[in-house]
């Protein structure tokens, strides 16, 4: 199993035995052993030219990938710079 940056190991410690895990073939995808879903769902979409496309619809609003990327980057900087959250800490955002 790939090493995790999470400092809280509760979820990993309570997984079922590895022989009970499903077999998932990811060989068709160009991802390394670790995946940052936030980057793939925001920054990568902007980099591929989809920045002006709608990413989210809800509460009567539409957000583009560029807007979503800007918001997540501001949120990440606030968590790290203002609240001193470190990589590996778990955060619940409501």
Name each region found by the language model:
Residues 21-22, 48, 59:
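General secondary-structure edge motif
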Residues 26, 45, 79-80:
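Hydrophobic alpha-helix position signal
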Residues 2-13, 31-55, 70-74:
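A short N-terminal helical cap/helix-turn-helix that marks the beginning
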């Amino acid at each position: 199993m790939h090493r995790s940056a999470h400092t809280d190991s509760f979820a990993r410690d309570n997984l079922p035995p590895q022989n009970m895990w499903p077999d998932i073939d990811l060989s068709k995808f160009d991802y390394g052993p670790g995946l940052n879903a936030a980057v793939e769902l925001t920054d990568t979409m902007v980099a591929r030219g989809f920045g002006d496309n709608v990413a989210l619809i809800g509460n009567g609003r539409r957000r583009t990938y560029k807007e979503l990327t800007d918001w997540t980057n501001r949120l990440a900087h606030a968590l790290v710079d203002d609240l001193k959250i470190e990589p590996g800490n778990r955060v619940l955002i409501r």
